[in-house]
């Protein structure tokens, strides 16, 4: 089972994204149905980013309306390889806490720690372009290059 980081979903959604080709090439290697997962956090992140003027402006596009963002998300789910993960895995919160604890404020750690914990406790391979995930021991990680 595969859990994609938001950066993969965004790269797949935006043809001008620096990681679009690598993400598309990876996606094209997957044939089995129902093996690529959104979790609720990556779903929300994608919807938020697709409606963000600054993010889409960097690609020369206006932000999507909320309706259009939902349609873009639904288009992913029309692909039988892609599904929304159901309930959070058992033990997720304890593992998330273990990954997120730091001695100083680290606001950027929350989402990465959550996704790493989701992957670890749910038995997912985490697919991302973000090398920061290498800090989380025990997770199965697939880093896609440019």
Curated annotation (Swiss-Prot):
Residue span, PINc domain: 3-142
Gene3D superfamilies listed in its UniProt record: 5'-nuclease (3.40.50.1010)
Cofactor(s) annotated in UniProt: Mg(2+)
Positions bound to Mg(2+): 5, 112
Cellular component per GO, a single term: extracellular region
Gene Ontology terms: biological process: negative regulation of growth
Keyword list, A-Z: Hydrolase, Magnesium, Metal-binding, Nuclease, Secreted, Toxin-antitoxin system
Class of enzymatic activity (EC top level): hydrolase
Principal subcellular localization: secreted
This enzyme's EC code(s): 3.1.-.-
Compartment(s) where it occurs, according to its Swiss-Prot or TrEMBL record: Secreted
Superkingdom: Bacteria
GO MF term set: magnesium ion binding; RNA nuclease activity
Function: Toxic component of a type II toxin-antitoxin (TA) system. An RNase. Upon expression in M.smegmatis inhibits colony formation. Its toxic effect is neutralized by coexpression with cognate antitoxin VapB41.
Protein family per UniProt: Belongs to the PINc/VapC protein family.
Protein name (record): Ribonuclease VapC41
Organism of this sequence: Mycobacterium tuberculosis (strain ATCC 25618 / H37Rv)
Encoding gene per record: vapC41
């Amino acid at each position: 089972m595969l859990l994609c980081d938001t950066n993969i979903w965004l790269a797949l959604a935006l043809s001008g994204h620096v990681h679009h080709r690598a993400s598309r090439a990876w996606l094209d290697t997957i044939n089995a149905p129902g093996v690529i997962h959104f979790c609720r956090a990556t779903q929300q992140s994608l919807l938020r980013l697709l409606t963000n003027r600054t993010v889409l402006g960097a690609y020369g596009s206006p932000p999507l309306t909320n309706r259009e963002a939902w349609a873009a998300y639904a288009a992913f789910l029309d692909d039988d390889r892609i599904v929304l993960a159901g309930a959070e895995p058992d033990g997720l919160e304890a593992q998330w806490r273990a990954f997120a604890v730091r001695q100083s404020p680290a606001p950027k750690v929350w989402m990465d720690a959550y996704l790493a914990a989701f992957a670890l406790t749910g038995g997912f391979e985490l697919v991302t372009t973000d090398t920061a995930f290498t800090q989380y021991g025990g997770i199965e990680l697939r880093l896609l290059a440019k």
